[in-house]
Amino acid sequence: MKVIKTRNVQQALPEALYQLSFEGVRRDSRNGPVFMFPEPVTTVYLRPAERVLFWAERDANPFFHLMESLWMLGGRNDVEYVARFVDRMRSYSDDGLTFHGAYGFRWRQHFFEDQLPKIIAALKENRDDRRQVLSMWDADADLGRQGKDLPCNLQAIFQIACDGRLDMTVTNRSNDLIWGAYGANAVHFSYLHEYVARSVGVEQGIYRQVSANFHAYEEVLNKVAPLADLAANPMTGTETPDPYAAGIAEPYPLMSTDPEEWNQELMMFLSEPDAVGFRDPFFRRVAIPMMKAHKAFKQTSNPSRFDAALAELDNVAATDWKLAGVEWIERRRAAFEARKARAMDDGVAYE
């Protein structure tokens, strides 16, 4: 068992790529050749709330990661909501309408009851409880199924540690370290972790993800491989560039109001993001302006759409999401201007 113990996802990705460059074994897979670690890998996040990835080489979509996390906490499985942020998500659905293995739906509806309130109530009643397991894998529905979407993450185990904080351990059968573990999973599951911790009334502790198969697809790996050179080196004292460690970015609390009220506001946000009356600062100062920024960016008929999106991002109180959003928009502005310049050089009109 390999253990990658790290402060946050920003530092985890270069470290894993560095170790994979020495230990990776090339192997075929259902979706093309991969380089994989020859043994299971556990990632230990000491500060899981530092969940945002800033590497330009990875180009993580902060709007998608944030909104998909809320979609999961809302127990949804519909394609349409997440496809507005990443259209290719439709290709992972068997029927174009729902996702078979949607994590949030598994948490809150698939097993005919909402698992999260039961786990929260049990931990509030007994802080020494070791039986609180959130299930995602369903042997009846998943074992032997030949579909596009099966849960990769199988269970999340919640226990209050000796220091009084809530720790979470997630088990995973097959994990793409670039797109899954150190991208989407770091956001989705750290928000699940924080949601349960705040609902119980304790601080968020350590998040561990145990991946039985930890790999990177060769084609994608080649694009981000240079990040391995930025892994921390204790021998030389070199540290990984990290906006969190530099004090440029910091997490923003997911929940500041009563959990029941927060849940109601989550449902309202998912169905009516333009509604008024949100009380929790997370919705008013993070989720809503992030949603508005993405909506402005998608107005392709507006020649000022990049500036409009950045103006909305000025209202985001979460410095980590704000920074990631600004950088993501600016990368797209730069690409747009480059294409426009090439079109002018070729003597053609650009639209």
From Swiss-Prot:
Keywords: Host-virus interaction, Inhibition of host innate immune response by virus, Methyltransferase, Restriction-modification system evasion by virus, Transferase, Viral immunoevasion
Top enzyme category: transferase
Reaction catalysed by this enzyme: dUMP + (6R)-5,10-methylene-5,6,7,8-tetrahydrofolate + H2O = 5-hydroxymethyl-dUMP + (6S)-5,6,7,8-tetrahydrofolate
Keyword Transferase among record annotations: yes
EC annotation from Swiss-Prot or TrEMBL: 2.1.2.-
Any one Gene Ontology BP term: symbiont-mediated evasion of host restriction-modification system
Domain of life: Viruses
GO terms, molecular function: thymidylate synthase activity
Leader sequence residues: none
Biological function: Catalyzes formation of 5-hydroxymethyldeoxyuridylate (5HMdUMP) as a step in the pathway that replaces dTMP by thymidine hypermodifications in the viral genome. As a final result of the pathway of hypermodification, 5-aminoethyl-2'-deoxyuridine (5-NedU) substitutes for about 30% of thymidines in the viral DNA. These modifications probably prevent degradation of viral genome by the host restriction-modification antiviral defense system.
Family: Belongs to the thymidylate synthase family.
Listed name of the protein: Deoxyuridylate hydroxymethyltransferase
Organism: Pseudomonas phage M6
